[in-house]
């Protein structure tokens, strides 16, 4: 037989001659997912349906011709195939009946096997039940025997007033373990009476074991710890460590604490709460030394935790019920002392547990009674009281904004000049002071620090605003207030790094991470920026005040120079006018009085702005005066020309007498030169002052221009 792929290729090749004439792709018919609808949809744009039909007819003829050629080429194979199919049905019928019989036999065997499996499972289940019943009967027999044996042992060896021997308790404990084991396997066969009897025996054994435990504790204090060790081992054997802890709490801890913890004992204690805690801690050294040596300080007897489950449980319950006055937060100072004393007490318990490992400390911290005890201390209320005390005292210094005594005198180097800053520093320092700060409320105290600085910042803004008011009337001047503000802000800004270190020392150890340090540094930087923003505002206000003192009336006196020199026959000016000194006097006084407080750099910045502003106004006035003088001079020249009938004017350049206009120009030059020289004495270059170079050039040029025209 030929390869099917080859035949398909042969059929396709047979229609190749017509492929070039077709209006569709003949390969579409060879696809496995060929669809007539899709074929018609793709060829909907054919020239016409008639042409599509004709092309399909041509393609069909080509396929038929190719198929005939294929049959002719492989004729022998086709004939053999037909011959082989003759009698095939008869052969199939011949093998069909044996196969069906074989299937029937297999199904019957499957059914037989299933029946046997079911029967076997039933027998195994019956055997299991019998075995379980047998074991139950055996356990029941053991239970009866052990009950009698244990009862006899308790009656003979453990009851009565005679001392209990450890060996008898150990035998009884083993019998009880065996009894509990067999009880579990025959529980459904036991009568209620026997179940009650087992419970009764267990309770009796624990009572005798409890008595032996108390005797062993007494003997251990007398240097005989062997009985205590055997007793603890019996508790471990019975898996009753909690019973030992309960017995110790009720029989040893509770009687002692009854006489120690109470409101009356607290009132009668000379040392107050610290004395109560000292007595509570003394119990450990008095009654728990040997017990802790065996259970806490070694792994010899695992499973016991007498410190938490016996000692601390009883102490915490009594503190909450019989001494709840210690939790009252009404008086912040008393609350702080009690809370710190309590934290020290809890810390000593943790220190005791540290010997057993971190797991014991964690168990103590996460214990429900520890959580309950810590929750009783109302720290939010305590902080609120501290907040009212600290913030209230600070706020009292800020209202009203400016008081008669806001500016202090005779202060030390560590004090601020303004009382509001002293109050702010005191408030921030008090947040971290001993007797106020508690690590558990660190975020709240830190937030209060930030609030104090921001509130002070708001007060500074209000103080600057009031200093600009027209009704300012205080024992101190505006300048004194602003300069004190400037100095105190810089001093407080320099104090922030010291405050940052104080906060880092106060933060709880577990929170003092690199992330916290970065956040704290960023926060302090923001506070420094907030304070620093006021420095610019203060300098601007000082500039405005100085300009008001120097400029308004003094600069206008330049306009009086023409009136002073015209037709007055004054001498040629050689000294500067008085207004120059009047403009300079406030600048010199400001530099002399405030350089030590503000610093040379700040004073120079303020004076430079003031001098620049004055010089600009001075430049404008001088320019107007020179222009006016020039116009007046030209008007007089034209008038003389008219009177002389147009004849050439007589030159005055050779005259020894200086004109009034020239005297005005000379006076302006003397004044400007003096202004410039005095500014240089204040350590200013001409280029540092706006319009000073232009002003100097303008008066010099006016003189030169006059000389040239002459």
Curated annotation (Swiss-Prot):
Chief location of this protein within or outside the cell: Golgi
InterPro entries hit by this protein: COG2, COG_complex_COG2_C, COG_su2_N
Descriptive protein name: Conserved oligomeric Golgi complex subunit 2
Superkingdom per UniProt: Eukaryota
Similarity annotation: Belongs to the COG2 family.
One annotated GO biological process: protein transport
Disulfide bonds: none
Residue ranges the record marks as coiled coil: none
Pfam families named in the record: COG2_C (PF12022), COG2_N (PF06148)
Role of this protein: Required for normal Golgi morphology and function.
Keywords for this protein: Golgi apparatus, Membrane, Protein transport, Transport
Cellular localization per UniProt: Golgi apparatus membrane
Membrane-related topology note: Peripheral membrane protein
GO cellular component: Golgi membrane; Golgi transport complex
Gene that specifies this protein: Cog2
